Regions:
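Short beta-strand and strand-turn-strand segments in soluble, beta-rich domains
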Residues: 80, 125-132
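Extended terminal and domain-junction accessory segments
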Residues: 1-97, 101-104, 152-156, 163-195
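Short aromatic-acidic-glycine turn motif
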Residues: 117-127, 181-185
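Short, flexible loop/turn segments at beta-strand junctions in immunoglobulin-like
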Residues: 138-139, 149-151
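Short beta-strand/loop motifs in extracellular/secreted proteins, especially
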Residues: 106-108, 118
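Short strand-edge motifs at loop-to-beta-strand transitions and within beta-strands
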Residues: 86, 135, 143-147
């Protein structure tokens, strides 16, 4: 080890990778990925999705229009732009089946607050493994999921894309229980005054 005297200087150099060393490897993706649709052994769900009392479609798309007064290509739910998107209304105890279809051109990590859902199928392929319970589901472009859950947590719950810029641009709706209301409303002056 070289020691420097008082006031001595030392120059160091760090090796740098050459151009292209950080590129992703070429070729097919590995085949050894876990597919939660078929992973594990089937188990009882505790409810029967075939006896759903509510059935909904949740089609995610895009179309030209205006949002907050700005023109653009905006997210839609069942063909409608926020705030004119459908609200999914349930009653406590309902067995709910929902088909989520994404034709928007981008991936959306969809997140339902207040509930866990079980994935029944992806692109028409039935789940055969352990029940795939989740509260967020990554829905790729051109993918369709069928999910189910029991409406067991009364409230007004947000259901939105967890890519928060997408949510801010209108990819948001609500799951609402009958008989539940709120004093809050969309738009207008907020009651709180942040510092």
């Amino acid at each position: 080890m070289r020691q420097l005297g008082r006031g001595g200087r030392c120059a160091t150099a760090c090796p740098c990778r050459g151009a292209g060393d950080g590129d992703a490897p070429a070729g097919a993706e590995p085949r050894d990925r876990v597919d939660l649709l078929s992973y594990g052994s089937p188990k009882a769900l505790g409810f029967d999705p075939a006896k759903a009392t509510r059935v909904f479609r949740y089609d995610i798309g895009r179309r030209p229009g205006f949002f907050d007064g700005k023109p653009g290509l905006w997210w839609t739910i069942n063909g409608h732009q926020y705030p004119n998107v459908p609200m999914f209304v349930v009653t406590e105890g309902d067995v709910v089946r929902m088909t989520i279809k994404n034709t928007s051109g981008q991936v959306h990590p969809m997140h339902l607050h207040g509930h866990h859902v079980v994935v029944l199928s992806r692109n028409g392929v039935r789940a055969t493994g352990s029940p795939w319970w989740t509260d967020s589901l990554n829905v790729e472009d051109k993918e369709t999921y069928e999910i189910a859950f029991v409406a067991d947590n009364p409230g007004i719950w947000m259901d939105h894309c967890h890519n928060l810029p997408h949510a801010a641009q209108g990819l948001v709706t609500h799951l609402m229980y009958t008989g539940v209301s709120t004093k809050y409303h969309l738009g207008g002056t907020p009651d709180n005054q942040p510092e």
